[in-house]
């Protein structure tokens, strides 16, 4: 299961006076709770790059033993550096071919690393996806579903380049906003 870190510490007593500390404590607590429920499950966090304390939250999740970090709401350019030396897998959230190309090339060039998983969120998912107005009009609610399906295939081609380069399978997860 995947746990969001957005204000994860809201139940902590000191949340309103020491929000960062409360959130960091809660990351470890929530992962421990999840491990009790699913001891053999794959457990991780969805951490938005737009968060003020993104790095601190990633490090807390990694040190707590997260199996995977999924990051979007911007490009997680430094995510490989934050998990270096740990077994935690990394997965960017992309919305189009361009964002997939940019993040995978950046990680390859800067860190000699690629994604362990790629998450695709379509234009109908809402949130922090980085679509331009013309793309929203092209792929949005009134648009033909076929158009974005073609974009998904283009993302898949980009991912395949890095599968070949790193001789590893990189699963693609369609997270939402593709057809609904």
Q: Whereabouts are the PLM-identified features?
A:
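Active-site entrance/lid segments in N-terminal catalytic domains of soluble metabolic enzymes
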Residues: 1-166
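Glycine-rich beta-strand-to-loop/alpha-helix junction loops that act as flexible
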Residues: 171-179
């Amino acid at each position: 299961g995947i746990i969001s870190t957005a204000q994860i510490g809201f139940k902590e007593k000191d949340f309103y006076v020491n929000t960062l500390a409360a959130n960091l404590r809660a990351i470890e607590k929530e992962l421990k709770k999840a491990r009790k429920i699913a001891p053999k499950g794959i457990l991780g966090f969805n951490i938005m790059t737009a968060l003020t304390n993104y790095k601190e939250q990633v490090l807390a999740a990694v040190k707590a033993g997260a199996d995977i970090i999924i990051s979007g709401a911007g490009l997680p350019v430094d995510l490989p550096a934050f998990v270096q030396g740990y077994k935690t897998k990394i997965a960017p959230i992309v919305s189009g071919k361009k964002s997939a190309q940019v993040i995978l090339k950046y990680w390859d060039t800067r860190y000699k690393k690629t994604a362990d998983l790629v998450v695709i969120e379509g234009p109908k998912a809402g949130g922090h996806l980085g679509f331009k107005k013309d793309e929203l009009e092209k792929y949005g609610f009134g648009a033909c579903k076929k158009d974005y399906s073609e974009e998904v295939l283009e993302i898949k081609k980009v991912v395949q380049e890095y599968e070949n380069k790193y001789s590893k399978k990189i699963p693609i997860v369609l997270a939402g906003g593709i057809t609904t």
